[in-house]
Amino acid sequence: MYSFLGCLALLVVGFLIYGKLVDTVFKPTDEPTPAVRINDGVDYIPLPTWKVFMIQLLNIAGLGPIFGALGGALWGPSVYLWIVFGTIFAGGVHDYMSGMISLRENGKSISEVVGKYLGSLMLHIMRLFSVVLLVLVGTVFMTGPANLLAMLTGMDPTMWLLIVLAYYFLATLLPIDTLIARFYPLFGACLLIMAFGIMFALLAGVGGHTMPELTLQNLHPKDLPIWPLMFITVACGAVSGFHSTQSPLMARCLKSERLARPVFYGAMVAEGVIALVWAAAGVTFYDSTGGLAAAMADVGQNKAVYEICVGFMGYVGSVLAMLGVIACPITSGDTAFRSARLTLADWIGLEQGNKVKRLYLALPLLAVGGLLSQINFTIIWRYFAWTNQTLAMIVLWTGAVYMYRKFKGSKAYLIAAIPATFMSVVTTTYILQAKEGLQLSTSISYPAGFVFAAIFLFLFLRVTVLKKES
């Protein structure tokens, strides 16, 4: 219990101190934001700050900090450390920078921002990378809820898929204040209530369960290595490239740059809290990582979430679990397709104020998502996890270049360059040894990951610090 409370306190302190430091470095101004200057009534619309925060939280969270945290809990309480320090020094910085830079670039999608600061080659890579990731996210958060609804109702999963797709169509096409701004705050509140309800149940010892204290021991039932597998598995609970595709959506709705820290950094810290709660629930509810692994293998993560909610919160928990497990991923999926539409629109220069022009992009994207939904969920999730963290790495390097150019003469770029280097090691090491990667031995993948990260760092220094000195 004390380990959990200590980690929870660190997240709060991280927001208050490190989040403030990052915000101070960026020097927010009172210049009119894109929401105020453009205000097209579709994507650029000034919204109340509390509503922007709740939409941002639900956009980036969904089931990410739940599924990822439960998966990370298989390694034991050591996952707490990655959630806490990853959130403060990588995830919070990543989300704040992607939102703030987009805010200062007229709400441009992240691929356009990357292209401006890393060059035309990276622009094309990021456009493709972003659209692929967003469609994967939309597909992942389409099939999970559809399958669970089929289990609960006895209806054909395909029918539920079509219903979810129909909702995606409306949410992707309609102005952001028609569906998303009206219902997301409610679902976001349910997500928070579910998480805090479980936290209080954990602290109260409901069901006679005892929270294990922090240990660095690898408790994975199959003895899989913590490095780099746990760092990829936790994903959204610590740092997530998907968030950078969502932040521009809310950058187009913020009334002031001074609101960026509570909205972007704050939402990431809130997600870190949710992930910490679910990681603690995972290592506590099933009494051992072996029990958690057996539950996840037997009934899957959707049902495991349901069991934990009901076990800790009773009937109320089951209702919230239904809202969380079904509504939250759907709300992540619809904004994923919306972001994909906007990314493609920026790519080809297609104005999106006209409904017909929005249809040109929305229909084929949803069609691809529908086709991908027929592929095994586990396969899609594995590729999503690596793609997600790789995008985070690229965005952090973009932030480092932006900060070097914007704040010349200071070392402010280190705020982004250090986590960018770390994530470079994580992502390259993982893909070199993973089943869906090159399947190299750890004796090769471990040193190779550090070598690749060193190369990325050298390239960054070459086009910034070393170029200036020469």
Where are these regions (language model features)?
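Extracellular/periplasmic helix-exit of transmembrane alpha-helices
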Residues: 203-213, 265-307
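Hydrophobic alpha-helical segments and their helix-loop junctions in multi-pass secondary transporters
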Residues: 138-142, 146-163, 171-172, 191-218, ...
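Membrane-interface loop-to-helix entry segments
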Residues: 5, 9-27, 119, 129, ...
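Hydrophobic, membrane-embedded alpha-helices of multi-pass small-molecule transporters
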Residues: 47-64, 201-207, 216-278, 323-332
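Extracellular loop-to-transmembrane helix junctions
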Residues: 1-19, 72-102, 111, 445-453
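Helix-loop-helix module between adjacent transmembrane segments
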Residues: 10-15, 90-106, 110-175, 235-239, ...
